[in-house]
Each structure stands twice: as structure tokens, then as C-alpha cells.
From Swiss-Prot:
This is Deformed epidermal autoregulatory factor 1 homolog. Residues 34-62, 162-190 are annotated as: Disordered. Residues 403-478 are annotated as: Interaction with LMO4. Zn(2+) 1 binds at residues 504, 507, 524, 528. Residues 193-273 form the SAND domain. May be phosphorylated by DNA-PK complex in a DNA independent manner (in vitro).
């Protein structure tokens, strides 16, 4: 009963109405426990307005928003939610619950309408509102408009007018989503700020200095559908821009403008919906009596091919070279981007003690990453010395190789371990601080010194052998070149002699024919042969006879010699 009285005081009702409200609320609570809920109907007089104003500013554990209009008794309906019980007192301090009262069927004048001041900064400063609370208060029944009051958690109030009111009175429970704005007022969903006239069916458009009127219901694909009226003629968008001298643009969406912006902006905001090129509707066919399916234009974007290379250059991973210094032999590790490690030369470890080396990682073409403080440790299982590296061969060295075991302090694990400490990238290896080496390290260096000399001697010998082989190959190539030049010169001389022998005896030109009688004289043509025949006819036959006679005489002499023997 006390909770009901406090709720009645919050609502600003009179003492007589408070008793009725308490009874109605108690009845509603009892009905809710039994499974049914009834809405209490209250009536009040006009004299209770002052009480409502005075009681609205009291601090209560629940915020109540009331919209009251002066009217005759029996024309007010109030919907209230259940009041908090004793167990909900703690929860009411943390969350605010709103009770909405809607007054309908009001026929009084506008000056009799008033609004209670319960939703002001002074009264709600001590309350905690969850999110935002929207209160709709009806001004009058004749004009279907309402006032939207948004109460923020900081107590500020934002009021907007000119919104369309709900068709049905509000009921307790979850509030329905707000009514969407009219098409002329839907400015929040567009990219550009348009005048409300943009939603009209006719839009004044312009292309350069030609103006016309665009009819939305006749808009087609652009090339079809005469939707722009200029004077007494109808044009399609492409025809309209061609008439304005922009036929070469081939883009009517940007050539034709409305309110200073191209029609492409209207299309992006969904105000204009051009049809596809394959549309067969009445507008595209320029026949409003036809009826066909409407196919809207769907903008498309170019898709990247799967095998297309990215625009940003991809950094090519170059192999890294790792050199351990100082070492008994200069050994280089090459780490490829795929993770494979290759070595150049033989890797040797001084097993007498730990080898403190400096690992230099160089990457080309950029500066190299430098790592210092690398400690190389080997397992207690010792393979045969130089067993896996047959070259270079050291005579009498493999058999006399002495291996000293690691000290126990230098074997933390049973596997080789390399620890790298990152340093800033430098062009040269960082200098290692000089410090006194332990005696074991000195002994190890002394023991490994003969190995270095042997390796250097073997390297020098191999270099000398290689140089000798290169020198021999060079001499052979030089002799071969000399022989080739001599053969070329000889062939040239022989060719010149043959060419000189085959020259025409009459004119000296290159001869292609020869005398069939003696086969010793060459001619370039029949003209030269006829011209030289006067002198050659005496020599051609005589030379043949003389030759035959000489042969016969020679044969006779040989026979005579044989007979004599």
C-alpha cells in the first residue's frame, strides 16, 4: 500500500485519484500472479494539475514520464507497469524503469495541453538511466504529430518536433522501434544533403547550357527510355547530352546534372534507379502501354585475377651468409630462404675447450644483420676427425689427430647449441673486447696452430696446381689460335690462285668455261672464245699432238729399258 501511494504521488494525481490508482495497481498485481493482467482505468478532474506539477520534482527510486492533457473525465487511459516489490528495492537504485502514459480522445484546445516536468536535469540527476529513454507526448488529436524527447544518461534532453505519431497508443512492455521517417525527410541515409524536392517525380536537370525535366517513371537504361523533356520533345539521357554537345563523353550519368551534382550522385544514394541494358520494360521500350519485367542496373567492380601479381613489390629474400670468426678455417654457412643450410669448406671445432666466435650474418643488397656472442658447443659423442670431409687431404694428419673432451661445465645439453645475441645492423663485425683468455683456451689455440699452417700449405699447393693447369690451357689455346690463323691464310692463298687460274685469257674476268680441246684455256663467254680462236687454234691441236708423241716416245724408251734388263 505504501509503494502504491508513492507511485500515485509520482504520477501527480490527486488524493482521491491516488486511492483509486493504488487499488487498481494492487488488483493488477494480484491478476498478474494468477496469470491474467488487467489495465486499470482512472478518471481525474482538471483541478489535479497543480498537484501533478508539485509532486513531479520529488526524488524517487523510479523515474516516471507522464504526458497529461486537459480533458473531460472518462477520456484518459493510463497504462502502468508493475511497481517494485520489497525485493526489487536494491535493483531499482541501479536501473531506471519508465512508465509511459498516453492520453487519447482529447478534444480540448491547444492552450490546455501541458507537460509535466519530471524529465528535467534537477530531478533525474540522482538516478541511473540505462541507455536512453524515449517519451512520446501527444500535442492534440487533430494534428497527427508528436514530440520526441530523448533523455540521455547525463540528464540532457534533446527535443525534436514534426515527427509522425504512432497509429496506436503505447502499451506497457518492450517498446516498438521508432516509426521510419518520411521519404522527404530521410536525410540520414544519403551521402549528400539533398533538397526535399529531390524525391519528386520530376527533376530539373541541365547539361551544359541546355535544361530539361527528368521524369523518374520514364527513366530507362540511359540509351533507351526517353525520360527528359526539353520543350515539346522527349529525349533519352544519351540523346540529351548529345544535343548539348557532350556526345563524346559517353557517360550521361556525369554529364547531366541536378542541383549542381551529376546524376551519378543520385544513383549512389538510391534516388534514381536506372535500368539494365537488357531491360524490356515499358519505359525502355518507349511505350507506356506495354508491361514487361524491370531489370535494374547493377554496378560491377573489376575483380583481380588469381594469377595477377600484387601492385606492391615483394621483397626477395636473398641467402644469408654466416661466418664464424675466429676459426681454424674460414667457414661460411649459406642459409637460403627455404631454410636449407649449405657450407663452403670444412667446419672444425676445437674440442679442447669452448670456442668463442663471432657470427656475422650478411644479407645483400641491404645491410647485414650482425650477431655477436655465439657459443658453439658439441655433444659428448665425438665423430671421427674429418670422417665426413675427405678433401682436403692432410697426409699423416688424420691418424695423429688428438681429440680432447669438453669440460663438464661446457656441456649443458647433449646437443649442439648456438646462441645468438642480436646487435644493430652494421657494415663491419663489431670489435670484440680484449680480455685475458683462460689457460685452457690458450692451450687450445696453441694446439690448433699447426692445423692452420697445414691447411694454408695445402691451399697454396692447390692454388699453384690450378694456376699451372690454367697456364697450360692458355698455351694450348694460343697454339690452336696460331694454327687456325695459318690454315686460314693458306686457304686464302690457294683460293686466290685458283681464282687467278680460272680467269679469262681474253679479258681477264672470272672464267666460267674452258676449252674442250685442251682443257687448259678458260673463257668467260663465247665471244671471248671466238675472238681468241684465231691464235688459240694453232696451239690447241699441236699441244695435243706433241703430248701424244711424247707419251709414245716415252713408252718406247721404257720398253726398251725393260728388254735390255
Amino acid at each position: 500500500m505504501e509503494d502504491s501511494d508513492s507511485a500515485a504521488k509520482q504520477l501527480g494525481l490527486a488524493e482521491a485519484a491516488a486511492v483509486a490508482a493504488a487499488a487498481a495497481v494492487a488488483a493488477a498485481a494480484a491478476a498478474a500472479a494468477g496469470g491474467e493482467a488487467e489495465e486499470p482505468v482512472l478518471s481525474r478532474d482538471e483541478d489535479s494539475e497543480e498537484d501533478a506539477d508539485s509532486e513531479a520534482e520529488r526524488e524517487t527510486p523510479r523515474v516516471t514520464a507522464v504526458a497529461v492533457m486537459a480533458a473531460e473525465p472518462g477520456h484518459m487511459d493510463m497504462g502502468a507497469e508493475a511497481l517494485p516489490g520489497p525485493d526489487e528495492t536494491a535493483a531499482a537504485a541501479a536501473f531506471a524503469e519508465v512508465t509511459t502514459v498516453t492520453v487519447a480522445n482529447v478534444g480540448a484546445a491547444a492552450d490546455n495541453v501541458f507537460t509535466t516536468s519530471v524529465a528535467n536535469a534537477a530531478s533525474i540527476s540522482g538516478h541511473v538511466l540505462s541507455g536512453r529513454t524515449a517519451l512520446q507526448i501527444g500535442d492534440s488529436l487533430n494534428t497527427e504529430k508528436a514530440t520526441l524527447i530523448v533523455v540521455h544518461t547525463d540528464g540532457s534532453i534533446v527535443e525534436t518536433t514534426g515527427l509522425k505519431g504512432p497509429a496506436a497508443p503505447l502499451t506497457p512492455g518492450p517498446q516498438s522501434p521508432p516509426t521510419p521517417l518520411a521519404p522527404g525527410q530521410e536525410k540520414g541515409g544519403t551521402k549528400y544533403n539533398w533538397d526535399p524536392s529531390v524525391y519528386d517525380s520530376e527533376l530539373p536537370v541541365r547539361c551544359r547550357n541546355i535544361s530539361g525535366t527528368l521524369y523518374k517513371n520514364r527513366l530507362g537504361s540511359g540509351g533507351r527510355g526517353r525520360c527528359i523533356k526539353q520543350g515539346e520533345n522527349w529525349y533519352s539521357p544519351t540523346e540529351f547530352e548529345a544535343m548539348a554537345g557532350r556526345a563524346s563523353s559517353k557517360d550521361w550519368k556525369r554529364s547531366i546534372r541536378y542541383a549542381g551534382r551529376p546524376l551519378q550522385c543520385l544513383i549512389q544514394d538510391g534516388i534514381l534507379n536506372p535500368h539494365a541494358a537488357s531491360c524490356t520494360c515499358a519505359a525502355c521500350c518507349d511505350n507506356m502501354t506495354l508491361s514487361g519485367p524491370v531489370r535494374l542496373f547493377v554496378p560491377y567492380k573489376r575483380r583481380k585475377k588469381e594469377n595477377e601479381l600484387p601492385t606492391t613489390p615483394v621483397k626477395k629474400d636473398s641467402p644469408k651468409n654466416i661466418t664464424l670468426l675466429p676459426a681454424t678455417a674460414a667457414t661460411t654457412f649459406t642459409v637460403t630462404p627455404s631454410g636449407q643450410i649449405t657450407t663452403s669448406g670444412a667446419l672444425t671445432f676445437d674440442r679442447a675447450s669452448t670456442v668463442e666466435a663471432t657470427a656475422v650474418i650478411s644479407e645483400s643488397p641491404a645491410q647485414g644483420d650482425v650477431f655477436a656472442g655465439a657459443t658453439v658447443q658439441e655433444a659428448s659423442v665425438q665423430p671421427p676427425c674429418r670422417a665426413s670431409h675427405p678433401e682436403p687431404h692432410y697426409p699423416g694428419y688424420q691418424d695423429s689427430c688428438q681429440i680432447a673432451p669438453f669440460p663438464e661445465a661446457a656441456l649443458p645439453t647433449s646437443h649442439p647449441k648456438i646462441v645468438l645475441t642480436s646487435l644493430p645492423a652494421l657494415a663491419v663485425p663489431p670489435p670484440t673486447p680484449t680480455k685475458a683468455a683462460p689457460p685452457a683456451l690458450v692451450n687450445g689455440l696453441e694446439l690448433s696452430e699447426p692445423r692452420s699452417w697445414l691447411y694454408l700449405e695445402e691451399m697454396v699447393n692447390s692454388l699453384l696446381t690450378t694456376a699451372q693447369q690454367l697456364k697450360t690451357l692458355f698455351e694450348q689455346a694460343k697454339h690452336a689460335s696460331t694454327y687456325r690463323e695459318a690454315a686460314a691464310n693458306q686457304a686464302k692463298i690457294h683460293a686466290d690462285a685458283e681464282r687467278k687460274e680460272q680467269s679469262c685469257v681474253n679479258c681477264g674476268r672470272e672464267a666460267m668455261n674452258e676449252c674442250t680441246g685442251c682443257h687448259k684455256v678458260n673463257y668467260c663467254s663465247t665471244f671471248c672464245q671466238r675472238k681468241d680462236w684465231k691464235d688459240h687454234q694453232h696451239i690447241c691441236g699441236q699441244s695435243a699432238a706433241v703430248t701424244v708423241q711424247a707419251d709414245e716416245v716415252h713408252v718406247a724408251e721404257s720398253v726398251m729399258e725393260k728388254v735390255t734388263v
